[in-house]
């Protein structure tokens, strides 16, 4: 028996699930190391996801090998903790890997020189590299023959090249090897990450998936995938995130989807899947979505459009994914009666305030949900390269006064990621700030449906675009409209959805205590004061319907009410492309609202997993019933 075993610390701070990359690496180590090598190592610390526990483990076990799995959300925490470790243990073995580690030779060498406490950086896929690094550490500590790493030899950085693992079938599954058993005994993750393939054939400028060494799609065995899905069902994991870059690009992906449905039927879990669907494989994707929708695993289709601006699409490598392409996708999804959400990006090269507002308006025209991502420069992407940044004059928050907390407070913004794009040649910083704030308004009044139907009416009856209405609302003096002002300036442009109850923010009074009557009364006065619109029955009907479909705590449901004009049919006809008749041409209607998620009966904030939209609007003829689930109410969870 070996005394004084070397502790191996598997560290992924700020993580809400079993660390997938580290799990693959540790499982592969245990599978591949010789028994005498395993005997020298102590893996008993398991997976460490918070800094306090890391320090406790170090106090108990002391110096060792520290594996940091580094992402955008934990790079700063990892740097701080690893510096403390190196200061305490000069001979600690600090290994950094993960997507935030640069793979370009020049950048990798610069990174390790700037962070001399790091002993080895693993570039790209880490299973083989970490295995060989630990073997060398246990023997002669010579790393020059190990591919996919950067390290310091003497005083000089050494880059050993980069490739990918051709045969992924040799890799051990952390789920099937029992790697996460102890993790699940302590934590209750709502989600796990699975992969059925690796690689991406596309090369989008903002993404590091399709780099030249990773463009070949490599498949894991179906039997392994099926067994992992069985593990998910047996362990009652609510959500599966499939990390495949293009689910549906392979015909066999339909089989995977069918098996997920079968697992849910058998165990009641998972409740939902999150996936990146293939861009150019309509038939497979439609079949997958159709099957998973029927099983209650998806409630919406998500299209990662980024933008419809043709020049920007050309620059970022997506010129073939134009408006016509997405219109076809919309038709297919609508044929499945499936709500559609699009993902947009603010801060892409050659984009302007006009092009961004045009993207938002396109979503409104087709009644689409919207999720806006702020462009962040991550390593190993084309957009992060120095020549690319110089060409398009890309500036990040760290390079501007938007890194100053006091200035952000002064202009009404919350802290911004230091790597977030805040200006380019085509969009000044002031314009960017305006678009961030417009995004916040859009999320609140359109995304949460608070003014969705009112704005739809104004656009179709009075030619006031939704984006123009919100732009006006952003800049107009609202001192006479305190309820509107409160919601307009509530704050965070990155907060896409609003908790229904239990929210200690400016929506509390409106949602929790039913402030809708005061709010919509102000909305009417605001519209009449700022636009050439008569105070007629059509406008009042739309305002009444808008208020009627909004939820609030304690409301008695279901509820039914008669209205003078059939707004649901009017809305359906226009969104569906039928002739644009005026609302006055539609007769009476009765609208019934229901609360399938019991939102109005909750006295505390529900913990919902349902991305890309809020829950304030209730179910009715206007709003397709989209399922969700409260993680706190799942039996045995």
Give short role names for the model-derived ranges.
Residues 1-11, 31, 37-40, 55-64, ...:
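Radical SAM enzyme core and accessory elements
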Residues 6, 62, 118, 219-220, ...:
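A structural motif corresponding to the C-terminal lobe/cap of the Radical SAM core domain
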Residues 9-13, 69, 97, 243:
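Short hydrophobic segments within beta-strands
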Residues 19-32:
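Short, charged N-terminal beta->alpha structural module
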Residues 25, 54, 77, 81-85, ...:
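A general structural detector for well-ordered alpha-helical segments in enzyme core domains, enriched
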Residues 36, 169, 173-335, 346:
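Radical SAM [4Fe-4S] cluster-binding motif and immediate context
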Residues 37-164:
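Glycine-rich beta-alpha loop elements in corrinoid/cobalamin-binding modules
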């Amino acid at each position: 028996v070996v005394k004084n075993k070397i502790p191996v610390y598997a560290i992924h701070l700020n993580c809400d699930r079993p660390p997938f990359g580290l799990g693959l690496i540790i499982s592969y180590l245990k599978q591949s190391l010789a028994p005498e090598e395993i005997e020298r190592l102590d893996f008993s610390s398991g997976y460490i996801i918070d800094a306090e526990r890391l320090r406790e483990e170090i106090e108990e076990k002391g110096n060792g090998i520290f594996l940091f799995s580094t992402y955008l959300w934990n790079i700063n925490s990892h740097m701080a903790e690893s510096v403390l470790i190196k200061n305490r243990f000069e001979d600690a073995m600090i290994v950094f890997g993960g997507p935030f580690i640069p793979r370009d030779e020049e950048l990798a060498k610069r990174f390790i020189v700037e962070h001399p406490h790091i002993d080895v950086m693993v570039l790209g896929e880490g299973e083989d590299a970490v295995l060989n690094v630990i073997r060398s550490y246990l023997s002669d500590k010579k790393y020059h023959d190990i591919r996919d790493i950067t390290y310091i030899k003497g005083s000089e950085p050494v880059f050993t090249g980069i490739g990918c693992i051709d045969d992924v079938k040799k890799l051990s599954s952390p789920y099937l090897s029992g790697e996460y058993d102890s993790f699940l005994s302590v934590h209750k993750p709502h989600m796990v990450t699975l992969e059925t393939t690796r690689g991406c054939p596309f090369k989008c400028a903002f993404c590091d998936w399709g780099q030249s060494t990773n463009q070949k799609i490599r498949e894991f065995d179906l039997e392994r995938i099926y067994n992992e899905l069985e593990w998910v069902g047996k362990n009652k994991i609510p959500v599966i995130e499939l990390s495949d870059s293009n689910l549906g690009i392979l015909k066999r992906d339909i089989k995977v989807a069918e098996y997920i449905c079968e697992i849910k039927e058998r165990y009641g879990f998972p409740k939902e899947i999150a996936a990146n669907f293939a861009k150019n494989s309509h038939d497979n994707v439609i079949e997958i979505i159709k099957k998973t929708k029927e099983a209650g695993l998806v409630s919406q289709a998500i299209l990662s459009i980024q933008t419809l601006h043709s020049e920007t699409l050309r620059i970022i490598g997506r010129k073939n994914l134009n408006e016509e392409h997405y219109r076809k996708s919309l038709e297919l999804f609508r044929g499945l009666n499936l709500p559609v959400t699009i993902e947009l990006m603010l801060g892409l090269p050659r984009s302007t305030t006009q092009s961004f507002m045009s993207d938002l308006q396109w979503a409104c025209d087709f009644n689409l949900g919207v999720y806006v991502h702020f462009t962040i420069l991550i390593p190993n992407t084309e957009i992060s390269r120095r020549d690319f940044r110089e060409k398009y004059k890309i500036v990040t928050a760290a390079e501007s006064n938007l890194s100053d907390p006091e200035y952000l407070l002064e202009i009404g913004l919350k802290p911004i990621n230091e790597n977030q794009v805040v200006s380019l040649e085509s969009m000044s910083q002031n314009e960017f700030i305006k678009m961030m704030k417009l995004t916040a308004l859009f999320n609140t009044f359109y995304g949460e449906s608070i003014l969705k139907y009112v704005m739809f009416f104004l656009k179709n009856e009075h030619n006031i675009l939704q984006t123009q209405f919100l732009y006006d609302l952003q800049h107009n003096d609202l001192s006479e409209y305190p309820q509107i002002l409160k919601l307009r300036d509530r704050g965070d442009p990155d907060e896409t959805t609003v908790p229904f109850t239990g929210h200690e923010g400016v929506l509390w009074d409106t949602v929790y205590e039913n402030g809708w009557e005061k709010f919509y009364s102000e909305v009417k006065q605001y519209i009449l004061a700022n636009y050439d619109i008569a105070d007629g029955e059509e406008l009042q009907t739309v305002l009444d319907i808008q208020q009627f479909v909004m939820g609030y705590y304690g409301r008695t449901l279901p509820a039914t009410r008669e209205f003078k004009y059939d707004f649901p049919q009017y809305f359906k006809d226009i969104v569906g492309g039928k002739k644009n008749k005026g609302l006055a041409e539609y007769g009476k209607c009765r609208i019934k609202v229901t609360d399938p998620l019991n939102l109005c009966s909750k006295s505390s904030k529900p913990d919902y997993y349902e991305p890309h939209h809020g829950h304030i609007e209730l179910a009715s003829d206007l709003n397709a019933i989209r399922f969700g689930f409260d993680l706190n109410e799942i039996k045995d969870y």
